[in-house]
């Protein structure tokens, strides 16, 4: 995980958002909407939402794309979190890793799974379907493509749409990790 504690681009405090900016971000991802109500008694806005508020049109589009993958995808929640956490670890994104630990646990990943996600190699501790998912994540991070052998193994478990979903999910979270790492967004940042 990156060790830089300096934020190059701090989240925009919710008190500074216009109603138009809030409206652009709202309605794209149900998980995010609870933070976008503008209600003073609402939950604290996570730093990533404040970051997206700095460019609401791009932030809203990002939330919409994420919503399609997270809320309308066909992968099991556990598999989705497995992939996201692997990307978080492999890209050294402290924010991504820390934000998805609880989600991964809620989705069924146990402490041994979470520790194994930090291993540099994918071992037989994972059942075959998970092993192929992790291999896809590793190959996309390392090589920006999936090998024929991994593709073939993945197709034993997933249909075409699910394979595309895996590719888009990993790719989108690699992109997000690059943004988070570059701007210096870390879990301990507060609004």
Give residue ranges: language-model regions:
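Secretory/endomembrane lumenal or extracellular ectodomains immediately following the signal peptide
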Residues: 1-77
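Acidic, carboxylate-rich catalytic segments that either coordinate divalent cations
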Residues: 153-155, 162, 171-175, 179-191
